[in-house]
Amino acid sequence: MEEFKRYLELDRXQQHDFIYPLIFQEYIYALAHDRGLNKSIFFENADYDNKSSLLIVKRLITHLITQMYQQNHFFFYTNDFNPNKFLGYNTNLYSQMIFEGFVVVVEIPFYLRLLSFLEGKDREXLIXLXSLHSIFPFLEDKFSHLNYILDILIPHPVHLEILXQTLRYWVKDPSSLHLLXFFLHEYSNWNSLITPKKYSSSFSKRNQKFFLFLYNFHVCEYESIFVFLRNQSSHLCSISFETFLERILFYKKIELEIFVKDFKAILWVFKDPLLHYVRYRGKSILASKGSSLLMDKWKYYVVNFWECYFYIWAQPRRIHINQLSNNSLDFLGYLSSIRLKPSMVRSQMIENSFLIENASKKFDTLVPITPMIESLSKAKFCNVLGQPMSKPVWGGLSDSDIIERFGRIYRNLSHYYSGSLKKITLYRIKYILRLSCARTLARKHKSTVRSFLKRLGVGLLEEFFTEEEQVFYLTFPKASSTSRKLYQRRIWYLDIFCINDTANHE
């Protein structure tokens, strides 16, 4: 990393190709390999697979560029998906290395910006803010004062070349951009209509880091316009997303006088002191205290912004305007809503007393039962009606492993949905998983569920599935000592960085 810093901190005016030469450095692929093993960013360990060869990677890049100019495409272009050979080596293996190495190289400038942003800040607090549950206290604090939300599904680019064009604003390196364009061109050829879908799925799975980086960067470009408008507002001063506003150009070359004239009108329309934006993956929420007319203007602006500056067919039906008082918000697996909580206040004036009825807004979160049943049904724990089923694919495991898997799934779900006060959905999920576990064990031992539980003892499964309540107590020692009262509390954890999917526990 220090070598990257010394290279990238040179005078930018002297760097004609400040990224492209790094692709030919051997430690880049060592970092890419270590990152694939450790699931982390920029490890110092330089050991990597002996099957990888820097010389082959260099020759393959040169050969790819030569083929690009000769218009003789061979990269990932087979019908039977047999590995192509280049100098006796597997081109699919080394092309994947180039993809991973390219991602590491392009991420370096952004990583250095992140390090400079973190200087002097509490990193532990910033890491805790990355938890999915950290969003809900923010919603609970802000949304009770708002009226309308825009429920937005972020569209995907029409063509992969748009991703490369968006990257031009950050990466001033023609050679690297040409190489990226060639990768995307070969992918689009290989992923044509006549190519079976399973091949493209395999390709995208093997290069998830590459396309995930491009997609995340593309989404950040969407979001930067909201930050820009927020910073320009006279009512607000944003402290977030500072690194996304340091571009030389703003999306597109526009004549200055026209841009200034139009932009003042935009600021006049959208000058809103209570405008909040939240996103997770491909779904985002834009909330405001304004009227429905203001939200219609926001919807019109977002659609036109996507179509004009990103060349995306932004279907208006992907953006829904909902009133918080009348609609629930389906976000991050919770059904969130604003409900009125009535209260009575007795007022005394001299000899007369009377009651005043008052209603306050309260942010409420529920666990939706239908998506949970669908997820369990997809994972073969129950049928579509929620009736528990055995899991025969786990029949070859030991009894302790089977019980541990079922218990871990329930504890993960209970841990994630601890923010809901009404636990009736979790009680039903617990019933489905316990009975599915019992049926799996009974089928393995060729017995009935009743006789197996009688021999095993119901208390064993009950104790294993209620282990998560002890975790709650240890995590929050100031809470009530009774597990029942503790289980009814709303708890938001700061260690959840992804949604646990029961279908992935195969």
Swiss-Prot record:
Superkingdom of source: Eukaryota
Biological processes per GO annotation: mRNA processing; RNA splicing; tRNA processing
Pfam families tied to this protein: Intron_maturas2, MatK_N
Keyword annotations: Chloroplast, mRNA processing, Plastid, RNA-binding, tRNA processing
Record GO terms (molecular function): RNA binding
Keyword Signal listed: no
PANTHER family: MATURASE K
Protein name (Swiss-Prot/TrEMBL): Maturase K
